[in-house]
C-alpha cells in the first residue's frame, strides 16, 4: 500500500512538471515564430525580448503588450498570436492529448492524470470524455461568437478583414486574452471605439463569461442542464461567486465611476468593466480617468480572476469563496466550513490560504520593485502587477515603456498566474510522505 502511494505521488508530481514544461515549450516556439521577419509588418527581425514578452502574454492569455498587435504584427504574426492564445487558453496538455486520441492511439493512466491536473478535474474517471467535450464545445462557442461579431466588423472593415477580426476577437474574448486589433484606429485603444455599441459589448461579455466560468461547470451544465441541484459543489460555488463578482462591482461603477451619460450607456459600461476586469483585459473607456478607489477595486478583481479549470488566471473565484466562507465560519465559532449543505475539506481551506499568501506577496513585492525601478506611483505599478498575475491584460499605459527588469517581472507573474501557484510549488518540491506522523498539538493565539 505504501509503495502504491509513493508511485501515485511520483506520477502526480510528474504531471505538474509536464504541464509547466509544455507551457515553456509553447512559449519558446511562439517566441521563435514571432522573431521571424514575416511576423512583422516591416519584415524585420523582432528582438528576442519583445517577441518573448508577446509570446508569454499570448500563451498565458493575458493581453499586456509592448508592440501594438494591429500595427506592428503582420497577418502571419497575428495568426501566431491567435494560435498561442487558443492553445494557451485550452491548455497545451488538453490540445495535445486530444490530438493523440484523434489519431487512434490509446491514452494511458499517466496521460489521464496529467490531463486531470491540466483542467483541474476532481477525478481521473471520465477525463478523456470531458476533455473532448471541452474542446468541441469551445470551438463551437468561438465560431458562434465570430458569426455574431461578423455583421459589426464586416460592415466597418469589409468582408475579408471583418471576418478575420470577428474570428480573432471571438477567440481572444472566449480565452479571456484581451488581445485586440483596433490599434488601426489608435494604438493600444482596445474596444474604446465601440464603447456605445451595445450589441458588440454584450457578445464580448458573454464570450468572456463563458470562457471564464470553468470547464467543469460546462460539464455539469451539459450533463444536468437546468437541474442546478445536481451540480457539483464547485459548480454551484463558481456560479454564485461569479454572479456576485459581476453584479456588485458593476453597481459601484454605475453609481461612482460612470455617473454621467444615459442610463443605457452607464449600465453597459459598468457591466462591461465589471466582467472584463477580472479576466479578459478589454476596455471600452479610459482607465486612467478612474479615481483611486475605482482603480483599487479593479486591482482586487484582477487578483481574484476567473474560475478553476477555465481559460482565465488569478487566484480563482472558488479560492475567494472558500476564504470568505472560512472567515464566516471563524466569526460564527464553528469548526466546519460549509456551503450548499456540504462540508468543505480542511485541505481546500489550507490550499486557499496558501494561494492567497503567494499571490499577495508576489503581487505587492513586484509592484514595489517596479515602482522603485521605474520611478512610478505605487498604485499604478500595483495595477500592472495585479493585471499580470491575474492574466487580465488591463494597463494604465505603462507596459510598453517599462525597462527590461520590469518586463521580466511581469513575464514571471503572467506565467505564475496562468499555470497556477500550487502547480509551480508542487512541481518544484518533493512529494510529501502520506504517512507523516502527527506531532503534539499546542495552541497559539492569532488575531
Language model features by range: what are they?
Residues 1-447:
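Membrane-proximal intracellular helices of multi-pass ion channels
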Amino acid at each position: 500500500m505504501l509503495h502504491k502511494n509513493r508511485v501515485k505521488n511520483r506520477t502526480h508530481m510528474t504531471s505538474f512538471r509536464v504541464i509547466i514544461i509544455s507551457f515553456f515549450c509553447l512559449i519558446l516556439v511562439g517566441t521563435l515564430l514571432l522573431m521571424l521577419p514575416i511576423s512583422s509588418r516591416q519584415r524585420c527581425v523582432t528582438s528576442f525580448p519583445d517577441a518573448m514578452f508577446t509570446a508569454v502574454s499570448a500563451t498565458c492569455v493575458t493581453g499586456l503588450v509592448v508592440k501594438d498587435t494591429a500595427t506592428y504584427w503582420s497577418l502571419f504574426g497575428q495568426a501566431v498570436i491567435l494560435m498561442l492564445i487558443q492553445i494557451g487558453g485550452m491548455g497545451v496538455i488538453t490540445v495535445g492529448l486530444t490530438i493523440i486520441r484523434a489519431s487512434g492511439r490509446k491514452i494511458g493512466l499517466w496521460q489521464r492524470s496529467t490531463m486531470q491536473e491540466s483542467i483541474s478535474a476532481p477525478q481521473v474517471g471520465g477525463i478523456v470524455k470531458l476533455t473532448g467535450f471541452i474542446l468541441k464545445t469551445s470551438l463551437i462557442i468561438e465560431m458562434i461568437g465570430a458569426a455574431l461579431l461578423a455583421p459589426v466588423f464586416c460592415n466597418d472593415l469589409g468582408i475579408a478583414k471583418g471576418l478575420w477580426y470577428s474570428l480573432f476577437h471571438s477567440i481572444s474574448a472566449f480565452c479571456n486574452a484581451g488581445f485586440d486589433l483596433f490599434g488601426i484606429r489608435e494604438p493600444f485603444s482596445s474596444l474604446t471605439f465601440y464603447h456605445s455599441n451595445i450589441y458588440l459589448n454584450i457578445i464580448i461579455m458573454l464570450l468572456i463569461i463563458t470562457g471564464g466560468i470553468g470547464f467543469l461547470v460546462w460539464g455539469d451544465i451539459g450533463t444536468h442542464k437546468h437541474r442546478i441541484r445536481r451540480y457539483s459543489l464547485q459548480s454551484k460555488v463558481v456560479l454564485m461567486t461569479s454572479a456576485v463578482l459581476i453584479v456588485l462591482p458593476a453597481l459601484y461603477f454605475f453609481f461612482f465611476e460612470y455617473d454621467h451619460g444615459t442610463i443605457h450607456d452607464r449600465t453597459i459600461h459598468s457591466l462591461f468593466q465589471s466582467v472584463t476586469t477580472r479576466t479578459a483585459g478589454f476596455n471600452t473607456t479610459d482607465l486612467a480617468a478612474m479615481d483611486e478607489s475605482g482603480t483599487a477595486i479593479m486591482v482586487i478583481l484582477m487578483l481574484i480572476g476567473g474560475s478553476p479549470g477555465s481559460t482565465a488566471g488569478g487566484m480563482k473565484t472558488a479560492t475567494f469563496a472558500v476564504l470568505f466562507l472560512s472567515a464566516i465560519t471563524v466569526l460564527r465559532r464553528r469548526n466546519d466550513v460549509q456551503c450548499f449543505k456540504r462540508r468543505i475539506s480542511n485541505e481546500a481551506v489550507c490550499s486557499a490560504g496558501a494561494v492567497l499568501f503567494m499571490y499577495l506577496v508576489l503581487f505587492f513585492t513586484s509592484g514595489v520593485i517596479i515602482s522603485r525601478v521605474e520611478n512610478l506611483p505605487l498604485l499604478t505599478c500595483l495595477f500592472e502587477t495585479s493585471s499580470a498575475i491575474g492574466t487580465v491584460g488591463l494597463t494604465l499605459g505603462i507596459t510598453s515603456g517599462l525597462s527590461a527588469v520590469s518586463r521580466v517581472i511581469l513575464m514571471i507573474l503572467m506565467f505564475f498566474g496562468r499555470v497556477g501557484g500550487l502547480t509551480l510549488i508542487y512541481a518544484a518540491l518533493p512529494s510529501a510522505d502520506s504517512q507523516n506522523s502527527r506531532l503534539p498539538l499546542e495552541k497559539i493565539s492569532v488575531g
